[in-house]
Protein backbone atom coordinates (compact mmCIF):
# COMPACT_ATOMS: atom_id res chain seq x y z
CA UNK A 1 0.00 0.00 0.00
CA UNK A 2 0.85 3.66 -0.01
CA UNK A 3 0.54 4.20 3.73
CA UNK A 4 0.10 2.18 6.88
CA UNK A 5 -3.01 1.73 8.96
CA UNK A 6 -3.74 3.68 12.17
CA UNK A 7 -1.01 2.97 14.69
CA UNK A 8 1.59 2.48 11.95
CA UNK A 9 3.03 5.99 11.71
CA UNK A 10 6.58 4.66 11.42
CA UNK A 11 5.54 2.30 8.61
CA UNK A 12 3.75 5.15 6.81
CA UNK A 13 6.82 7.38 7.11
CA UNK A 14 9.04 4.66 5.65
CA UNK A 15 6.67 4.20 2.71
CA UNK A 16 6.61 7.96 2.08
CA UNK A 17 10.41 7.97 2.06
CA UNK A 18 10.53 5.20 -0.54
CA UNK A 19 7.97 7.00 -2.72
CA UNK A 20 9.91 10.28 -2.54
CA UNK A 21 13.22 8.55 -3.25
CA UNK A 22 11.68 6.73 -6.23
CA UNK A 23 10.47 9.96 -7.80
CA UNK A 24 13.70 11.89 -7.13
CA UNK A 25 15.99 9.10 -8.36
CA UNK A 26 13.84 8.67 -11.47
CA UNK A 27 14.54 12.29 -12.38
CA UNK A 28 18.25 11.96 -11.61
CA UNK A 29 18.90 8.95 -13.85
CA UNK A 30 16.32 9.42 -16.63
CA UNK A 31 18.86 11.05 -18.97
CA UNK A 32 20.86 7.81 -18.80
CA UNK A 33 17.79 5.86 -19.99
CA UNK A 34 17.37 4.26 -16.58
CA UNK A 35 13.87 3.94 -15.18
CA UNK A 36 13.01 3.87 -11.49
CA UNK A 37 9.60 2.75 -10.30
CA UNK A 38 8.09 1.27 -7.16
CA UNK A 39 5.42 -1.32 -6.53
CA UNK A 40 3.09 -0.86 -3.55
CA UNK A 41 1.42 -4.18 -2.78
CA UNK A 42 -1.67 -4.39 -0.63
CA UNK A 43 -2.59 -7.57 1.23
CA UNK A 44 -0.76 -10.35 -0.62
CA UNK A 45 -0.66 -14.03 0.37
CA UNK A 46 2.84 -14.25 1.91
CA UNK A 47 4.48 -15.31 5.15
CA UNK A 48 3.96 -11.72 6.36
CA UNK A 49 0.17 -12.04 6.07
CA UNK A 50 -0.25 -15.70 7.04
CA UNK A 51 -1.17 -14.88 10.67
CA UNK A 52 -3.72 -12.18 9.77
CA UNK A 53 -7.48 -12.70 9.93
CA UNK A 54 -8.05 -13.00 6.20
CA UNK A 55 -11.84 -13.24 6.48
CA UNK A 56 -12.06 -9.92 8.33
CA UNK A 57 -9.53 -8.14 6.13
CA UNK A 58 -11.08 -9.35 2.85
CA UNK A 59 -14.22 -7.41 3.76
CA UNK A 60 -12.14 -4.20 3.55
CA UNK A 61 -10.77 -5.00 0.09
CA UNK A 62 -13.10 -4.04 -2.80
CA UNK A 63 -12.04 -7.16 -4.75
CA UNK A 64 -12.79 -9.21 -1.61
CA UNK A 65 -9.57 -11.25 -1.71
CA UNK A 66 -5.86 -11.12 -1.02
CA UNK A 67 -3.54 -10.83 -4.00
CA UNK A 68 -0.91 -13.34 -4.99
CA UNK A 69 2.84 -13.02 -5.24
CA UNK A 70 2.50 -13.88 -8.92
CA UNK A 71 0.27 -10.84 -9.48
CA UNK A 72 2.91 -8.58 -7.95
CA UNK A 73 5.68 -10.33 -9.89
CA UNK A 74 3.80 -9.71 -13.16
CA UNK A 75 3.85 -5.96 -12.54
CA UNK A 76 7.55 -6.05 -11.64
CA UNK A 77 8.31 -8.03 -14.82
CA UNK A 78 6.34 -5.51 -16.89
CA UNK A 79 8.19 -2.57 -15.33
CA UNK A 80 11.51 -4.26 -16.17
CA UNK A 81 10.46 -4.84 -19.79
CA UNK A 82 10.89 -2.73 -22.93
CA UNK A 83 7.13 -2.11 -22.92
CA UNK A 84 7.62 0.05 -19.80
CA UNK A 85 10.67 1.94 -21.05
CA UNK A 86 8.84 5.30 -20.93
CA UNK A 87 7.43 4.79 -17.43
CA UNK A 88 9.55 6.25 -14.65
CA UNK A 89 8.97 7.75 -11.21
CA UNK A 90 5.71 5.88 -10.75
CA UNK A 91 4.32 3.93 -7.83
CA UNK A 92 2.07 1.10 -9.00
CA UNK A 93 -0.47 -0.11 -6.45
CA UNK A 94 -1.37 -3.80 -6.55
CA UNK A 95 -4.06 -3.72 -3.91
CA UNK A 96 -7.43 -5.03 -5.06
CA UNK A 97 -8.79 -1.48 -4.75
CA UNK A 98 -7.86 -0.95 -1.08
CA UNK A 99 -5.82 2.25 -0.92
CA UNK A 100 -4.17 2.22 2.50
Description of each model-found segment:
Residues 27-31, 85:
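Alpha-helical segment proximal to the catalytic Tyr-Lys
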Residues 53-71:
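Catalytic Tyr-x(3-8)-Lys segment
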Residues 66-99:
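C-terminal substrate-recognition "lid" of short-chain dehydrogenase/reductases
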Amino acid sequence: GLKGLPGQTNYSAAKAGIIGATKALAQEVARKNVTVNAVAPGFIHTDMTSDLDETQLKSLIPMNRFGTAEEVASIVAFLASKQASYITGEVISVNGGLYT
